[in-house]
Amino acid sequence: MTAVVIGGGVLVNTALNPPVNSFDSAMVRLERRLLPSITVESAMSPAALASGVAPLPMAERLPQAAAFPLHGSPAGGMTLSGNTLRVEIVSSLEKADNQRASGRWLVDAAERFNRRGERGSDGRRIEVVLRPIASGLAAQMLVAGGYRPAGYSPASQQWLELLRLDGVTPTLLQPSLVGNRSVIAVRGGAWKQSGGGTLAFGPVMERTLAGQLRMGTCNPYLCSPGLDFMHTLLWTTAGHTGQGGALQAAELERGSIQRSLELFQQRVSRIDPTYIEQIEIWKRRPEALDAAVMAEQSYRQLQREPGFGDLVAVPFGADQGSPLVALPWTTGPERQALERFGRFVTSSPLQALARSQDFGDPSPVPATARPPRADGEVLSKVQRLWKQRKDGGRTVYLQLLVDVSGSMNENDRLSQLKRALTVASGAINSGNQVGLISFSDKPTRLMPLQPYDENSRARLLATAQGLQADGATALYDGLAVALHDLMQARRRDPNGRFHLLVLSDGLATKGLRLGDLRSVIENSDITITPIAYGDVNDGELREIAAIREGAVYRGDPKRILPLINDLFQTAL
């Protein structure tokens, strides 16, 4: 007998309980030690039950504006009265995030402006308030028509072109509130190890394709640097670096360009909804990536973090600039107020404040990485091509693990989750595989992993609508079953991509514990993304995510729909 002594002098037979240090040993631990103790039920819904599930109108597929906070009141509260003209601007996140001292420049500007007590031509006191929403999501909300702020300030002018394409014509008031730029942040040490030499957009792409750099990108439907990156990459792939000229929509139909994009996507190490989330993962695990796409402001801040002093920026694309526009429904008094605010924030004192938060003075871009601005048709095709080819020709396997314990009945959690799954089901590329497991007292396999088509989409919809909440929280029992299903799929298809999305509103109250699964998770080769749903202690979920270099997302009933849709769109 082979034995080791652990705390308290207990002898452990390592032949019966072998260490977990590989994918195969993780499977052995699951199949021989953990799964035999778990009772798994099956309750599959026939696809026919989904016949009564009607598609939601576009406006209902998007979050309500009230799900996002308002910022800007100098006293911390909103001063509504008949003598106040409140002017709402929907702003990109990097400059209006009230939670980050280094990312709240426009919030500071609004508070200072409001303290001036300026009045409009009709005598009302002007109050500017900001609602921070990712640029791409905000554009979708404006097009859908359910949200009508007075102004819009995305991170770049690309989103204005997409608005025009969809029939919403903005009026430019300020071409640039603050300077910024898209960059690839590259680890200097990793670049030297890959061969060194001139650090530029083209060589970075070549070494990523060669597997010499681990690179992260973000979703071009949401993220300005992500859209800028895809446009620049396709522009260079189409051969414009030498001859110049704008990328044309017809060029994106070429098989050679589509195959090149697919090959590149095979080499991308991570895709996250936004670069802000990817940066947080990178900060926790500096060795996870060698390079990542982001805004230059964020690069400057990341460079000051411990362990990131060797970062070098590779600028590309057009100036981002954060334009300010009025919208077709903006009233005359609102437009005048926006114009005043635009002049205020572009004044020298406010630009100095912006520089103190790492905005301004964007790095110059060489002509070989600076495509001319694209129109909405081209940008829309860039987004669609990314969605079609982002999996790099590999099958993506997504297992959904959903908490249906009794607490999910509170605060409309379960009904909003059903709605979110209904909407997100439309974001899945056909041919990828999706499965659904629920857990309360025990895990229940509701939909085994299966290729996604019209039939399986109908089954997913029917299954989602049939979810019911009751019982305790056997989180790790469910996690063990979901991991096993995905690891079996990986054995059959070692070239696939494997994701486990875990949604829970509480801590485990029965069954296995994290310690039972930690080494299995570590060696599973599965990307795990937990969602802490509601007002919960997310400490355990953060531990789960950290094991596989992931991030925890926080959701609530108001915002679970866009969150799950974004994760599906990015992963599937």
Please annotate each region the language model reported.
Residues 206, 393-452, 468, 478-480, ...:
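Von Willebrand factor
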Residues 174-183, 218-221, 258-264, 305-331, 335, 344-364, ...:
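Periplasmic-binding protein-like
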Residues 19-222:
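N-terminal segment of the mature folded domain
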